[in-house]
Design a protein with these regions (language model features):
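Acidic/polar active-site rim loop that often engages polyanionic ligands
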Residues: 88-92, 131-132, 180-184
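Beta-strand secondary-structure signal
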Residues: 35, 96, 149-151, 184-186
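Residues embedded in well-ordered beta-strands within globular domains across many folds
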Residues: 88, 119, 151, 292-293
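Glycine/threonine-rich beta-strand-loop-alpha-helix active-site module
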Residues: 115-120, 125-164
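Phosphate/pyrophosphate- and phosphate-bearing ligand-binding catalytic cores of soluble enzymes
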Residues: 15-16, 22, 28, 66, ...
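Anion-binding (especially nucleotide phosphate/pyrophosphate-binding) glycine-rich loop
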Residues: 1-128, 138
């Protein structure tokens, strides 16, 4: 617990029993016991130092790639969206960005400042922090090949600068020092033409809109692609395109997307995920691994 004096000294916004459905791209999820929007990096550090070290923590950006169960999260959510989003050009090829910066914003900023190589980030519906945590990718690009260094913070508020060799990077997974979260990154890009970079972003977003159910509540891609294949192909081949459970549905437009068609519950989405996994494994002997992270308790 935090002392009243410590709370008064914080500059961010502290909410209690905040419904997480309002903060996730699937529009589902029960309440967080505490929900904190830090004013800035210094405020975040002060908050972490004042927090009980045993308090469960969940870091939340745009709320994509995340399924919060209906019972909510029995701890503290730290929401970086619109808060830790500082961006700056550094030198001839460098770009510095805080973890709460939306990937699409980062891609546009890089293009505007004549840096190329980050255009694919425009197709990732999350923040840089989330992209770093899972090595997010789109249209053939991945996050970590751009990384020169990262800054992390632990639950005690200690900030560190780490190089990529401190992490094990894989396909849609990243393993690093335990108990640390991404605070910012230094990216290395190439000098280039703003007009060409903007045109590439426009083209990628048009491809995304043509192939994916943009505008409908989803988490983005639900499953990782298995080696040598595509999750969407396997799901469609199993006859699961359009499969429904309550208001949760496998998208008719892209089978690797599960959408909330109205008032789906997290339990329905989770059950549909497991149904898809079971049927694909039964038909093809392939166990699909989820990209989405499931957190919280199942029932209130």
């Amino acid at each position: 617990m935090m002392a009243a004096l410590e709370i008064q000294q914080l500059r961010g916004e502290l909410l209690h029993d905040e419904p997480l459905a309002a903060h996730t791209s699937w529009r589902v999820g029960g309440p967080a016991r505490r929900f904190y929007r830090p004013a800035n990096r210094e405020d975040l550090v002060a908050f972490l130092r004042a927090l009980d070290p045993d308090e469960p923590l969940l870091w939340l950006g745009l709320g994509s790639n995340l399924l919060v169960r209906d019972g909510g999260f029995p701890g503290t959510v730290i929401a970086t969206r619109g808060r830790l989003d500082f961006l700056a050009r550094r030198g001839r090829r460098g770009l510095y960005a805080e973890a709460g910066c939306a990937c699409a914003k980062l891609a546009r900023f890089a293009a505007r400042t004549r840096l190329v190589g980050a255009e694919f980030l425009a197709g990732i519906p999350g923040t840089l922090g989330g992209a770093l945590a899972m090595n997010a990718g789109a249209f053939g690009g991945e996050t970590w090949p751009l990384v020169r260094a990262v800054e992390t913070v632990d639950r005690y508020g200690s900030v560190r600068r780490r190089l990529p060799d401190a992490f094990t990077i894989g396909y849609r997974e990243v393993h690093g020092p335990a108990g640390e979260w991404f605070l910012a990154a230094e990216l290395e890009l190439e000098p280039g033409d703003t007009t060409a970079a903007r045109a590439r972003i426009k083209s990628l977003l048009e491809r995304r809109a043509a192939a994916q159910p943009i505008g409908l509540p989803s988490c983005g891609s639900t499953f990782r692609n298995p080696p040598g294949d595509h999750a969407a192909r396997l799901i469609e081949a199993a006859g699961l395109k359009g499969e429904r459970l309550g208001d949760a549905q496998v998208s008719e437009k892209h089978a690797n997307f599960i959408i909330n068609t109205g008032a789906a519950r997290a339990a329905e989405i989770e059950a549909l995920i497991e149904r898809v996994q079971g049927e694909v494994e039964r038909r093809f002997g392939v166990r699909l691994v989820t990209e989405v992270h499931r957190v919280g308790v199942k029932q209130l």
